[in-house]
Amino acid sequence: MAVDEDKLNSFIGKAMGDLGAAVGAALVLIGDELGLYRALAAESLTSAELAARTGTTERYVREWLANQAAGGYVEYDAERDSYHLNEEQALCLADDSGPVDLPAAYSIVDDLFHVRERAVANFRTGAGMEWGEHHPCLFRATERFFRAGYNASLLPDWLPAMDGVVEKLDAGGSAADVGCGHGVTTILMAQAFPRSEFVG
């Protein structure tokens, strides 16, 4: 078999990029769970300061920061040997009430690793998988990821688009929020329409 070295190197380079992205995804989840992004959004910190602020170990934090800076997820200030999030990074990585919650999106992918063995079996048998059989991280992630859209659009846009719904809820109707997940939409409607009864 004749191997084209240029194609081989190109393919290996692509695969290494994908591998790096997979590792980076895990590190995003770690940074989110430990509050590292939120701390860096508040102020510029050295690795020791970030570790102290978040109750973590400096050595691990230093390695995490090096990865995140190399990947463009945090900014590095060489003069002070400190790190921070710029406005755009902070919006996407440290504000789970904002319009973009990237750690939540990464958590959706995390589910695939949790259900991998089940997926392998399904490939062999052709079986399916019920929504409720996914790992709990998927449900937390979808709630976080879609919350911004619900907050921005449910009350001002989506409900008024349905004829008579807002009026009925204002007057004191009853509503069943089917497939409501962790109940973000149900809670939003219950707060907006206190005369109505909501089940979700």
Task: Report each predicted region and the residues it spans.
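Conserved Class I S-adenosyl-L-methionine-dependent methyltransferase catalytic core
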Residues: 2, 6, 14-33, 38-39, ...
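Conserved SAM-binding motif I beta-strand of class I
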Residues: 197-200
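A short acidic, leucine-rich amphipathic alpha-helix
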Residues: 49-54
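Conserved SAM-binding loop of SAM-dependent methyltransferases across substrates and taxa
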Residues: 182-195
